Amino acid sequence: DRLLMKKVLSILLICLVLFGCTNKQEKPDLSKEFVIETYKADMSGYENLKSSGHMFVGTTVSELKRTVDEGGYGVFVLSRTGCHSCQLAMQYLNEVAEELGVYIYYIDAQSDAYPILGTENYDVLYEVLYETIPENENGERDLQTPEVVTIVDGKITGSQIGTTWGGSNYTDKDVSKL
């Protein structure tokens, strides 16, 4: 159900940005200026997303790492147009971001301009996101898309990998964890 998914993403983004995943209920210091280098994100490959007027700004793996290293903050998504779950996720993320009035930093997992697979960028991304990547049945960790990550004060305060966009796949327990 589309409405349930929007509610779940809204709750996730609001909670992650305001509180993170710590037990402390302190609000992060978002007053300090932290500028992330961005570029105009080409979202034309996402079928259900307007190519202009969306809430995504392009950024790079090095900017994600700098955000962590320098104590910055932001909501990032690692996605690619050839991924069905990514197609669905980007539409919902955009709607939630519009409602909240926030921009989401988009890292294109299949970019020619900023390649990831088979490059040093993959190693950097893997290192930064390591704790958020679940182990497979062989005990190995592989990057997956889509992955949404919220960073507050340089710490990953929450993440969501993949989708359960059927709505009925989310339980009350899942929502309360967000």
Regions found by a protein language model. Give the residues of each.
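Positively charged n-region of N-terminal signal peptides that target proteins for export
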Residues: 1-8
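N-terminal leader/targeting and pre-domain segments
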Residues: 25-72, 178
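Thioredoxin-like thiol-disulfide oxidoreductase module
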Residues: 109-156
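Non-catalytic, surface beta->alpha helical segment in thiol-disulfide oxidoreductase systems
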Residues: 141-178
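Typically the conserved alpha-helix immediately C-terminal to a functionally engaged Cys/Sec
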Residues: 87-100
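Short active-site neighborhood of thiol/selenol oxidoreductases, capturing the structured segment around
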Residues: 69-81, 93
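The canonical Cys-X-X-Cys-His
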Residues: 83-87, 148
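C-terminal motif of bacterial Sec signal peptides marking the signal peptidase cleavage site
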Residues: 17-20
